[in-house]
Regions:
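TRNA-recognition modules of translation machinery and tRNA-sensing kinases, especially anticodon-binding
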Residues: 1-152
Length: 152
């Protein structure tokens, strides 16, 4: 049987490496939550129209499509989906969609996979875990020190 080569830019850990990643993730989650940041998880796909709004990153977006999609389907750009390349666009959408259910200032942390269609190299991957915390509210400067507290 031919030996399979790993897919470049998409790391997979052996169990010991996955245990290390899980441990680091737990420490981050506990630290964020200790400082009052609520955990959220957003979907992996977003409308291409939203992902490419700024324009400069559109070459890095992985488009999601069905294998047996109708070739005559004339879906518009707004109907196409892509994997998110960072957590900013999904978080902004999440806040807008759930604004009536969130308490502001809303303090969130998020740790999940993101995908970028860039050339993999040392320390740069096509799939990786991103972590972040944010505070959304009327007075962003008032909570500025809170956003940095988990980093200390």
């Amino acid at each position: 049987m031919a030996r399979l080569k790993p897919l470049s830019g998409f790391p997979e850990f052996l169990p010991s490496g996955q245990m290390v990643e899980n441990h680091v993730t737990r420490i981050l989650e506990e630290t964020f939550e200790l400082h009052g940041f609520a955990p959220i998880h957003t979907r992996a796909v977003e409308p291409m129209e939203q992902l490419t709004r700024k324009g400069e990153i559109d070459k890095e977006v992985y488009v999601v499509d069905r294998l047996h999609a109708d070739p005559h389907d004339s879906r518009s750009e707004k109907d196409r989906l892509g994997l998110h390349f960072d957590l900013t666009v999904p978080f902004a959408r999440y806040v807008l969609e759930n604004a009536g259910h969130l308490h502001f200032p809303f303090r969130r942390h998020q740790i999940q996979k993101v995908w970028r269609g860039e050339r993999p190299q040392e320390g740069r991957y096509r799939e990786f875990t991103q972590a972040g915390d944010d505070i959304v509210g009327d007075h962003p400067l008032a909570e500025h020190h809170d956003i940095e507290a988990p980093l200390m």
